[in-house]
Amino acid sequence: MIWSYFIIFALLSVVLWATGAWAAWRNRRALAFATTGFGLAIFFAYILIMWITLERPPLRTMGETRLWYSFFLPLAGVIVYSRWQYKWILSFSTLLATVFVCVNLFKPEIHSKTLMPALQSPWFAPHVIVYMMAYALLGAAVVMSVYLLFFKKGDDTAKEMEITDNLTYVGLSFMTLGM
């Protein structure tokens, strides 16, 4: 019953997250934070409604776990964006969250597929999200490094080196948190 309302909450959230990602590219920080925040609030409201309806934390099935993935990705994205102002991070986190939302929408059979007990821990979903963000940031640092090594012409690399360093620092921080 509660999953039948998911599409409403999901569509509203994804539209708001996408608006926030677009606003980040347009240097409209206030709009980016506001729309991403409203999207997170709407999505979290659905998680809370599900929690109250089920009378337990929604962590037992694959579908419920993907809800947490979809929630934590834009949250991690907005945190990184607020600190380092990387315009692409909100687009990336929104895209990943949208993939998990779509899996929940298009594969309803996972809503009842129970996870093994070890994966029902409240630490499992944040752990996976933090690892995904860590690998994404470290991958971006590798791409930036390859660009600087083989394609960048000229001596103006101070800004690019700082970005690469920051991506590495944040990626390793997320990796450490994930452990």
State what each model feature region is.
Residues 1-179:
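Polytopic transmembrane helical bundles with strong interfacial aromatic enrichment
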